[in-house]
Each structure stands twice: as structure tokens, then as C-alpha cells.
Design a protein with these regions (language model features):
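Class I S-adenosyl-L-methionine
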Residues: 165-210
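Short glycine-dipeptide loop
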Residues: 72-74, 152-157
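Class I SAM-dependent methyltransferase Rossmann-like catalytic core
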Residues: 1-48
Length: 210
């Protein structure tokens, strides 16, 4: 019974959410689109001609924004384990980038195996156990950072969802050693009660392999 009540509460909040309503009116696939739009307005990451990788992309809200801003000269590659409906200007790869086949598919889709920007709005399925949920969230952020190190051109950027808690400061310290600038943003479309923030890491210094 408690689970049903919780689901009804979530559904009511979702339906009445002004960002959800706005996304439906303006044709975006999710309320998350507005988070990336705000971040891009502040940092100017999505420029025409850029190559963008979107991790955990389904249902496609971030890929949709990215494709509209990098224009026809750019490229957006969306990866997710889940099925994602096609989007104009987006190459969708249903795969796990932790596995060799998924990583190979991504690299094959990238010009010269390199990207200008890596996006990650990935979040774990919430169990309700805060310690476990935080550990899973930070593990996803670590994976996004590792992937970014592998594919970003020198000077590239990374935007990744983080949650304040265990592992946050360690992740930030690592990112600051790899990028010239790392800032934390909480877009207006993020729920006020959520610990969710986004790290915006710019001007990648380059991996040792470069």
C-alpha cells in the first residue's frame, strides 16, 4: 500500500510540475532539457560543428537540445542501455559503453574517435538506501569521467550529474586535475529538495595518450 501511495504522489507531482508542462508545450522530450539549456546559456558549450556524446541519453531530452544547437555541421551520439526513439540529427546507439562492443560502437561513430563535449545525466535506480544510492550515483559519475578522458579532444568539456555526499569532493578533485575549470551548477529545473547538481568541466588538458 505504501508503494502505491508513493507512486501516486510521484505521478501527481510529475503531472503538475511546471517544467514537465512546459516541456510538453514546447516539444521537448523531458523536463531535463531545460537543465542543459540553462547550463549552455551560461557556458556556451553547444556550438555549431561540435561533436557531442550523450551518455544515458534516453528518453532524449539532452540529445534533442544538443542536436538543435550543434546544427548540421555537428554530430550527436546518444548512448543508452534503454531503447530511445530516433531523433533528427542524433545517432542513437543502444549499448553499454562499459563493454567492449559498446565502446567500439561509440568510437566508430566519432570522427577520429574524438569528441568536443561529453554529457552525462545518468542517475541510478533509487533504492531508498541513501548510502547505496550515493555510491551508485558516484560510480556512474566516475564512468562518465573515465569515458571523457578516453574520447575528449584537448580543450573539450564534460557536463555530469552529481549528488552531494560521499565521493563528491574526491570526484571534483580528480576533475580539477584534468580540466582547467570545474564549476558546480544547479539549474532552475532541478527540484529544490534534490541533492542533484551538475559539474561543468571545461578546457580538458588532454590525456597522457595525446
Amino acid at each position: 500500500m505504501a508503494k502505491k501511495r508513493g507512486k501516486r504522489t510521484w505521478m501527481t507531482r510529475h503531472v503538475n510540475d511546471p517544467w514537465v508542462q512546459r516541456s510538453q508545450q514546447e516539444g521537448y522530450r523531458s523536463r531535463a532539457s531545460y537543465k542543459l539549456l540553462e547550463i549552455d546559456e551560461r557556458h556556451g558549450l553547444l556550438r555549431p560543428g561540435r561533436v557531442v556524446v550523450d551518455l544515458g541519453a534516453a528518453p532524449g531530452g539532452w540529445s534533442q537540445v544538443a542536436a538543435s544547437r550543434v546544427a548540421s555541421g555537428g554530430r550527436v551520439i546518444a548512448l543508452d542501455l534503454l531503447t530511445m526513439e530516433p531523433l533528427e540529427g542524433v545517432r542513437v546507439i543502444q549499448a553499454d559503453f562499459e563493454e567492449e562492443a559498446g565502446l567500439d560502437a561509440l568510437l566508430a561513430a566519432l570522427p577520429d574517435g574524438r569528441a568536443d563535449l561529453v554529457l552525462s545525466d545518468m542517475a541510478p535506480n533509487i533504492s531508498g538506501v541513501k548510502v547505496a544510492d550515493q555510491a551508485r550515483a558516484m560510480a556512474l559519475a566516475e564512468l562518465a569521467l573515465e569515458l571523457a578522458i578516453s574520447v575528449l579532444r584537448p580543450g573539450g568539456a564534460l557536463v555530469v550529474k552529481l549528488f552531494h555526499g560521499a565521493g563528491f569532493e574526491s570526484w571534483m578533485a580528480t576533475a580539477r586535475s584534468l580540466f582547467e575549470s570545474v564549476r558546480v551548477r544547479k539549474p532552475e529545473a532541478s527540484r529544490a529538495e534534490s541533492r542533484e547538481v551538475y559539474a561543468v568541466a571545461e578546457r580538458f588538458r588532454g590525456s597522457t595518450a595525446d
